[in-house]
Regions:
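Alpha-helical linker/edge segments of TPR/alpha-solenoid repeat scaffolds
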Residues: 130-136
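Short, basic-rich loop-to-helix N-cap that marks the start of a DNA-contacting helix
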Residues: 111-124
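Short alpha-helical DNA-recognition segment
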Residues: 88-106
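Generic structural marker for isolated residues within well-ordered, non-membrane alpha-helices
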Residues: 81, 91, 120
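Helix-turn-helix/homeodomain-like alpha-helical modules used for DNA recognition
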Residues: 14, 139-157
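A short, Lys/Arg-rich alpha-helix, primarily the initiator
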Residues: 58-86
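N-terminal cysteine/histidine-rich coordination modules
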Residues: 1-67
Length: 157
């Protein structure tokens, strides 16, 4: 027996049932709009497109969105590593400044490994703000060691 379509609370039509679709997104972790694979079933209204996520759908979407999330972090990390200007800083020097193991950025650039969202954010910031952001990074730890606590408080105000 085929389940009857449910009524849509937005438009009132009786056309809500699990559907596949293109171009759907969901907020997930740090991403405001992570793409949902086209073949995922999400209860939606055929007429107005309203989506209805119940506990079962959310549980099924979790592992799917996690895979998409990891793939997107890997893609962005590789992109930002390629955009970093080598004339300003070598990958090895950057690994040392960021406290990363030797060769980690090369692995990420090749699509291996799973970078943290924080590392992807930092790589994106460095790539977008080069060369100023790279110079700030080079001097960051030196500045921290030379500052006393009152100087830090004055800078915060």
């Amino acid at each position: 027996m085929i389940a009857e379509d449910q009524r849509c609370v937005r438009c009132g039509s009786r056309s809500v049932r699990p559907r596949t679709g293109k171009g759907r997104t969901r907020p997930y972790r740090v991403f405001a709009a992570l793409p949902v694979p086209d073949d995922c079933l999400i209860p939606a209204c055929r007429r107005c497109g309203a989506q209805y996520l119940d506990d079962e759908t959310i549980a099924a979407l979790g592992p799917v969105l996690e895979r998409v999330y990891v793939a997107e972090l890997q893609r962005l990390a590789a992109l930002y590593i390629r955009r970093l200007p080598r004339r300003l800083i070598s990958q090895r020097r950057l690994e040392l400044l960021l406290g990363l193991s030797q060769g980690y950025l090369s692995r990420l650039a090749a699509g291996d490994g799973v970078p943290s969202a924080q590392l992807v954010l930092l790589l994106g910031h460095l790539a977008d703000g080069a060369p100023e952001s790279i110079e700030n990074l080079k001097n960051f730890w030196r500045r921290q060691l030379s500052q006393t606590e009152p100087e830090q408080k004055e800078k915060d105000q």
